[in-house]
Amino acid sequence: FCINKGMKLQDIRTRTAYNPNALPTQKAAVRAWLGGMSKEFPLSLTLTLKQTIVETNDRGTYRRALTRADCERIARRFTQKLNRQVFGKYAADKCGKSLKYLPVIEGERSNKHLHLHFAIGGLPSHVKFNQFDTLVTNAKLQVEHVDSEHKVDITDSGWIEYITKEVGTKDTDNVLWTLF
C-alpha cells in the first residue's frame, strides 16, 4: 500500500494496523521496564562465543553446535569469573559480592552466530572504567567457550533497546532472567 498526502491520520492508522487500545507486547513491556532501570547499568559488554563445542564420550569425540543452554552456562561462568576479578575470590565467593548484570542471548531467533550482550552495573568505586576491559579479558580467558573478541563500552540510551531487539512479542526467552 501507499501513504499519500491526501490520507487522514485515521486512514494511515487503519492501514498500518495501529490500535491505540491494544495491549502492549512482551517486547514493549520489557523494554519499558528495563528502560526505567538503564541508569543502573552504565557499562555495556558484548561477548562472542565459539559456535561449536567438542564433547567426548565412550563412543569418541565429536563437535556439536552451541545451544541456548550452553550460552546460559557460559554466561553464568563468565559472571562468576568477572566478579572474582572485580571483588577478589573471597569477597565474590564467600561474601556474595557481585556486579549487577542484565544478560541477553542474541542470534537464536535470527540464525546469526550466538553471542551475549550484557548491561552491567554496580561497579565499585575502586575500579575505573579504563581498567574494566582488562578485567573482562582476564575473566574471559578463564571461560572455555568464550571467543577472543569482546567489546566494552559506556552504555548509551539505546543499549537496552538494542540488546532486546530479539525479544519476542509474546515471550522474553532471550533475556537470561536467572542471572539478572
What label would you give each PLM region?
Residues 1-114, 122-180:
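Right-hand nucleic-acid polymerase module
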